[in-house]
């Protein structure tokens, strides 16, 4: 019981001190501008400016950051991690933001201890890309931002 209390106390302290992690799952546009990715990077950059520990997650070997076309965001200041190559440690106080187009990521991360939040930018994708018989609820996504 004491171990659980210590863990809870540690996670609460991370929230108070802004040392928890805020992950954003992003996709590779290969240099092509994207409005939805602009929103994600602007949000991530703003949170970093406020002192939060922001990290961008992706899965591609040849991932290109959007700094060639995204001029109003300091993309270089945001760490980019390839989740297929690097070990990502996630705790209960962390947040993972997942664009609605990544139902597969929602499914693969549903047992993670962090708070997972969908980023809904296109209403059509909310149900179109989710597996048959699944819902955000069955994928343990209970919150979204638009």
Task: Enumerate the language-model features and the residues they cover.
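Active-site capping/gating segments
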Residues: 146
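N-terminal pre-catalytic "stem/leader" segment of glycosyltransferase-like enzymes
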Residues: 1-95
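Extended catalytic core of nucleotide-activated donor transferases of GT-like folds
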Residues: 9, 63-142
